[in-house]
Amino acid sequence: MSKQLIYSGKAKDIYTTEDENLIISTYKDQATAFNGVKKEQIAGKGVLNNQISSFIFEKLNAAGVATHFVEKLSDTEQLNKKVKIIPLEVVLRNYTAGSFSKRFGVDEGIALETPIVEFYYKNDDLDDPFINDEHVKFLQIADDQQIAYLKEETRRINELLKVWFAEIGLKLIDFKLEFGFDKDGKIILADEFSPDNCRLWDADGNHMDKDVFRRGLGELTDVYEIVWEKLQELK
């Protein structure tokens, strides 16, 4: 399958394929935090992220969630549907943590009575600012119907993920999703789902996600390997 690099990101390289509606996503060993301010090459990270994300997306597909995932091609590659990415990071929070705790001056780990969905404008120059529905419409990113769908679909995905992670003894604190328009103009889940873009805590409150790298709490791949081993118990 011939391929040409069309985009190089912090965590993945994206390549064309012979089918104009399909792309290959290649996962890198690079770890970044604070919008790329902190970065490091960590051997084995790309393989683990691809394994975890492929596994989660396969389960989401089977549960009826429309995603860009087609198949895992190799240790670091997966075949995806080509989408036009919506420039929003859709964050869902089940518990207080991270920037939410800092913004509102509250402790981490407080259960939210109703999960909170937040939007962040994907713009590196602006440092991905926190925005609301009215900003989304002003920027012509999405209309009312599309905004409602993004929130509803994110909440539906959350209900699935919470159950799966609870089954393996992990608490889903929060996560970030990205969506895009497929060739038919339908909004589908894109990007990835791995400990890079979610927070997972074990029963003792230990971080099982990229906060290990952000906060210098230990070896990133050791933690990701534990998450991957636990996920395989769901098979």
From Swiss-Prot:
Keyword Ligase in annotation: yes
Lineage, opening ranks: Bacteria, Bacillati, Bacillota, Bacilli, Lactobacillales
Alphabetical list of Pfam families matching this protein: SAICAR_synt
Keyword Ribosomal protein: no
Enzyme Commission code(s) on record: 6.3.2.6
Gene Ontology MF, one: phosphoribosylaminoimidazolesuccinocarboxamide synthase activity
One GO biological process term: 'de novo' IMP biosynthetic process
Alphabetical list of CDD domains matching this protein: SAICAR_synt_PurC
Sorted UniProt keywords: ATP-binding, Ligase, Nucleotide-binding, Purine biosynthesis
Protein name per its UniProtKB record: Phosphoribosylaminoimidazole-succinocarboxamide synthase
Family listed: Belongs to the SAICAR synthetase family.
Pathway where it operates: Purine metabolism; IMP biosynthesis via de novo pathway; 5-amino-1-(5-phospho-D-ribosyl)imidazole-4-carboxamide from 5-amino-1-(5-phospho-D-ribosyl)imidazole-4-carboxylate: step 1/2
Catalyzed reactions per annotation: 5-amino-1-(5-phospho-D-ribosyl)imidazole-4-carboxylate + L-aspartate + ATP = (2S)-2-[5-amino-1-(5-phospho-beta-D-ribosyl)imidazole-4-carboxamido]succinate + ADP + phosphate + 2 H(+)
Originating gene: purC
InterPro entries: SAICAR_synt/ADE2_N, SAICAR_synt_PurC, SAICAR_synth, SAICAR_synthetase, SAICAR_synthetase_CS
